Amino acid sequence: MPAFAIYFLAALAEIAGCFTFWAWLRLGKSGLWLLPGMASLAIFAWLLTMVDTPAAGRAYAAYGGIYIIASLCWLWVAEGARPDRWDMTGAAVALAGSAIILAGPR
């Protein structure tokens, strides 16, 4: 599976897992929300191990840009708040950084 696809799936799993904690602590949802949230966070961690790189830190660093894009998508789709131009500019810079990390000659 291509790294971008892994990172995209990992971002969805991480955001969904973290949102369950947000829902529990900030929105008053039941603590039972944490069960699928913890499973989702475990899937997130497992997915990052599938990236073809010898160094975990590099996989995590490259993932950061994808996470930012996915978070802004979550903001828009799940929370109904449209990202502004500063959000999009920051995301573009982060995504460029991820691309440099992933594609750099080694």
Curated annotation (Swiss-Prot):
InterPro entries: UPF0060. It comes from the Bacteria. One of its GO terms (cellular component) is plasma membrane. The chain crosses the membrane at residues 4-24, 31-51, 61-81. It is a multi-pass membrane protein. It is found in: Cell inner membrane. Keywords: Cell inner membrane, Cell membrane, Membrane, Transmembrane, Transmembrane helix. Coiled coil: none annotated. Disulfide bonds: none annotated. Its main location: membrane. PANTHER family: UPF0060 MEMBRANE PROTEIN YNFA. Belongs to the UPF0060 family. This is UPF0060 membrane protein Smed_0659.
